[in-house]
Structure formats: structure tokens, C-alpha cells
């Protein structure tokens, strides 16, 4: 399998367009024409992680946090530059799945929820998205070639299904006049053609490529086509809310979460004996959603990187917070490995997939 094929699989399951506009996801370093020798999943791409990839003869690293995020002004033999140089010198590809993995229904937040053992899970902040229903009219004899052209561009796909079209037959008519150069018919003569009305769905960001595909592949000089905008509730969204199988006190839950996530420390705001049954989680840095989680009935909001004033505000407003540190997202290493094994199972010439055991938490705890 080549990197380009892997990128297509990833885009099908963890769409890159679902990432936040400020994010930097996808193939950050590498060559999409290279064959994959192995994949190593990691939270952060550090020098130690790159060394591990070299030792494992693995030429592809998939990290949650982008190595190239802020503007890189120079690549020298220190800091991030040394990591980038080592990746390039050893022909190692670096792929980032960040906020697009955060909002995925099987992504980081679901992995954290599963680790804690939440049940009856739903999303905190479901996104709404738009798409288009496309309809155009094709002479019957050209319909299959036209559909093939659209499919080659990745259009008319729904999840794991290709060639998602609906056809209905009819009869079209036209009369070429003036300087017309008809593909079918003669000047100044009404032509009747057996046509197929072809309908299919596209994502919101596929409008321009679809328009160009129709104009380039339709046999008519001036094809008729419509784009009908439609809205739907997305299956993607940020954060998970679910229930514990039994009620605990806030103090008990903090110890339980620490143990389940295997992290060195936690801290919380709120009364130690507050009853906890319904739990909301946003991995990484999720402050800003704690009040929505509370409105949804969460007894505690679990996240990382909680600042003093945010914690104080929540405490004053009786919103319980549990800080599990940003590094708790490390659960994605094994979680993503399992997802990749499922997504790539049907492909031949398999390669090993590893979850890095290297701890990239920059903090030491006492």
C-alpha cells in the first residue's frame, strides 16, 4: 500500500475537512508515492518516537498532535528542526490526525469514555453540516462512461459505498441553431434523445470539483445540471457524555478516573462528596464546553489544561471539573492502532502497525 492509498482510507474514516480551520492535519512530511513498511501511532512526534520508528523499520508515523503547527521559519540541527531533518533523512512519512480525530464518533473522546467505562454515550456538541443533491441529464448511451468519470474523482460516495446514483428515464429535446456545434443532432432540426436523469449526493466542499467534472465529461456543449443545498445533522461532534454504571462521589470518581486512565495525577473542583453519575469528557483542552455539559445534565466535566480562573469560575457556579491533564489523550495510540487494523484489514500486502510505548508527557510528577 502506498501513502496516497492510506491517505484516502484515512480521509474516508477521519475526514480531513472535519478538522478546525486553524489546524494542520494530513501528510505533513513525506512522499505519497512511497510504499508503506509499517505504521507507528503516537500522541506526539518526538526525537525518541522517530528513533523508535527507525528501529522498527517503520516508515510512517501517525501522530495526534501536529509537529508542524505554527509557522516554521527555519529547519536547523536543533529543536523541532532536528526532528524534521531526521524524518526527511530517513524517508519517514509523518501524518497528523488532530481535531478531525477529536470530533470523530470513534475518536479520542470516545476512547477516553471507553477507558473510563461510560455507557449510554452521546455527543456534547453535534455539528450540523450541509451537502448537495446533484441532478443532471445524460444521453442514455453515455451514462456509464459519465458515472465512471465521476467515480474516479471520488464523487457519489457514501461511506464505504461507491457509485451511489439514482437514475430515471425520460426524453429530452433540443434544436441547435446559429453557431451551435452539437455533439448529437443537426443545425435547425429538433432532436429527440433518450436521456437519463442522474441524481447523486456530494459533500459541501465538493461543489466546484463536481461542476467541473460535469462540464468536462458531459457530451453536451451546455449541459443542464442543478445543485440543491440540503442540511443534515452530522455524525461528527466534539465531546462525549455518558453514564457510569454506578454513582460515585466526586472524590471517588477522581481516583477511579486516575486509575482507569493510568495517569499520575488529577485535580478537581467541587464538593468531594458530590454524587457523580453522568460524565462529560473532552480530551486535551476542552474548557469552554463545561457549562453546556452541565446544561445537558453532566455531574462533572472532564478535560485537561484547566486554568486557575476557569476553575474558580466553575467552582463559584457549582460546575464540577476534573482535570486529567492533556497527556491523557495518549489513549489514542492504542485506540488508533485498533481502528487502523480494522480499516486496513481488507488490503493485501499488509504491514505491521505499532502503538508507540514512549511517554511524551513533558511533565514530571511528584
From Swiss-Prot:
Coiled-coil features, chain-numbered ranges: none
PANTHER family in alphabetical order: GTP CYCLOHYDROLASE 1 TYPE 2 HOMOLOG, NGG1 INTERACTING FACTOR 3
Quaternary structure, from the entry: Homohexamer.
Pfam families listed in its UniProt record: DUF34_NIF3
GO cellular component labels: cytoplasm
Listed name of the protein: GTP cyclohydrolase 1 type 2 homolog
Binding-site list for a divalent metal cation 1: 64, 102, 329
Annotated keywords: Metal-binding
Source species, domain of life: Bacteria
Residues reported to bind a divalent metal cation 2: 65, 326, 329
Family: Belongs to the GTP cyclohydrolase I type 2/NIF3 family.
Upper classification of the organism: Bacteria, Bacillati, Bacillota, Bacilli, Bacillales
One term of GO molecular function: metal ion binding
InterPro entries cross-referenced by the UniProt entry: DUF34/NIF3 (IPR002678), DUF34/NIF3_bac (IPR017221), DUF34/NIF3_sf (IPR036069), N-reg_PII/ATP_PRibTrfase_C (IPR015867)
Disulfide bond annotation, renumbered to this chain: none
Amino acid at each position: 500500500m502506498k501513502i496516497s492509498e492510506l491517505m484516502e482510507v484515512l480521509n474516508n474514516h477521519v475526514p480531513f475537512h472535519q478538522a478546525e480551520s486553524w489546524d494542520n492535519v494530513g501528510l505533513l512530511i513525506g512522499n505519497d508515492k512511497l510504499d508503506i513498511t509499517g505504521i507507528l501511532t503516537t500522541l506526539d512526534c518526538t526525537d525518541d518516537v522517530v528513533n523508535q520508528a527507525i528501529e522498527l523499520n517503520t516508515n510512517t508515523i501517525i501522530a495526534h498532535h501536529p509537529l508542524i503547527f505554527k509557522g516554521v521559519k527555519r529547519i536547523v540541527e536543533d529543536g523541532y528542526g532536528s526532528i524534521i531533518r531526521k524524518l526527511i533523512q530517513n524517508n519517514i512519512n509523518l501524518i497528523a490526525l488532530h481535531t478531525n480525530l477529536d470530533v470523530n464518533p470513534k475518536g479520542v473522546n470516545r476512547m477516553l469514555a471507553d477507558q473510563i467505562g461510560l455507557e449510554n454515550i452521546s455527543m456534547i456538541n453535534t455539528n450540523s453540516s450541509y451537502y448537495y443533491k446533484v441532478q443532471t441529464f445524460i444521453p442514455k448511451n453515455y451514462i456509464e462512461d459519465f458515472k465512471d468519470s465521476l467515480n474516479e474523482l471520488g464523487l457519489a460516495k457514501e461511506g464505504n459505498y461507491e457509485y451511489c446514483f439514482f437514475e430515471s428515464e425520460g426524453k429530452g429535446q433540443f434544436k441547435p441553431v446559429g453557431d451551435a456545434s452539437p455533439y448529437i443532432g443537426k443545425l435547425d432540426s429538433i432532436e429527440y434523445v433518450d436521456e437519463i436523469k442522474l441524481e447523486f449526493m456530494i459533500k459541501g466542499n465538493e461543489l466546484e470539483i463536481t461542476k467541473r467534472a460535469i462540464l468536462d465529461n458531459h457530451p453536451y456543449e451546455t449541459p443542464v445540471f442543478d445543485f440543491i443545498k440540503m442540511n443534515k445533522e452530522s455524525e461528527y461532534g466534539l465531546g462525549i457524555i455518558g453514564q457510569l454504571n454506578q454513582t460515585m462521589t466526586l472524590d471517588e470518581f477522581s481516583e477511579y478516573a486516575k486509575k482507569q486512565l493510568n495517569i499520575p495525577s488529577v485535580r478537581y473542583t467541587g464538593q468531594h462528596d458530590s454524587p457523580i453519575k453522568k460524565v462529560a469528557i473532552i480530551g486535551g483542552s476542552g474548557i469552554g464546553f463545561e457549562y453546556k455539559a452541565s446544561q445537558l445534565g453532566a455531574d462533572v466535566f472532564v478535560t485537561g489544561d484547566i486554568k486557575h480562573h476557569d476553575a474558580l469560575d466553575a467552582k463559584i457556579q457549582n460546575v464540577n471539573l476534573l482535570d486529567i491533564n492533556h497527556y491523557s489523550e495518549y489513549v489514542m495510540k492504542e485506540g488508533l492502532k485498533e481502528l487502523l487494523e480494522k480499516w486496513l484489514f481488507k488490503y493485501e500486502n499488509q504491514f505491521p502497525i505499532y502503538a508507540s510505548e514512549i511517554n511524551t508527557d513533558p511533565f514530571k510528577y511528584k
